[in-house]
A protein has these predicted regions:
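Active-site-proximal alpha-helix that buttresses catalytic centers in soluble enzyme cores
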Residues: 1-215
Length: 215
């Protein structure tokens, strides 16, 4: 993109958005684009991000142009498919492992992404939720339920990076294999594979700014 990029976090990690914006303000920056690294339009995207943006703008005088979140569209599905190992058997079952939400629409978006993954990859796909969502179990229990009846299972994490929720399942892979009788493999979090999508959301934020300027 040819521009400086900094990271910021809503919670559980540093720097916070407020700290990152304070640093930008100290450097003389008056305007910055912000891309929420969120897949679904649930509480974090609807409430937490706008609130953090308002507070940082008011405190430091830096205008934040908020672009679209990552979403669960075809571009995300293609990034996920690109993480599949070439050695994956043709009949392997995929489990899209995602955080889950109390927002039903967010979980529907994850289910729709699983459907898109199945269309694009030719594999069967189920969704397993880490914390909340439809189903009787979460985390490792949800993965076991989704893996039963298949010989080869590959876990696709819908995660930007490593973290406790994902570690809890990856650390249980051997147990899941014993419980289901399946051969279990897994992809790593998406990390830098998301860079083209982040760039596209950044451009969308700039486009919105230019449109507003000429309105």
């Amino acid at each position: 993109l040819g521009t400086e990029a900094v990271e910021a976090h809503l919670e559980l990690a540093d720097p916070s958005l407020d700290s990152a914006v304070a640093q930008l303000a100290a450097q003389g920056v008056t305007r910055a684009a912000l891309v929420p690294l969120l897949f679904t339009n649930a509480f974090h995207n609807k409430i937490d991000v706008p609130e953090a943006v308002r507070e940082a703008q008011d405190r430091h005088g830096v205008q934040l142009l908020v672009g679209p979140h990552l979403g669960t569209g075809v571009d995300v599905a293609r990034v996920l498919i690109n993480t599949l190992p070439h050695s994956l058997p043709a009949g392997a079952h995929l489990i899209l492992y995602t955080v889950g939400s109390s927002d039903a629409a967010a979980n529907v978006a994850a289910e729709n992404l699983a459907w898109e993954l199945s269309l694009l990859s030719g594999h069967t796909v189920d969704v397993a939720y880490a914390t909340s969502g439809p189903g009787v179990g979460f985390g490792g229990a949800a993965v076991i339920e989704a893996a039963c009846g298949y010989e080869d299972v590959h876990i696709l994490p819908l995660f930007v990076t490593d973290g406790l929720l994902l570690d809890r399942v990856i650390d249980q892979v051997d147990h899941i294999a014993v419980a289901t009788g399946a051969r279990i493999t897994y992809s790593t979090p998406l990390k830098t594979a998301l860079a083209p999508l982040v760039a596209a959301r950044y451009r969308a934020a700039l486009s919105e700014l230019l449109t507003a300027a000429h309105a």
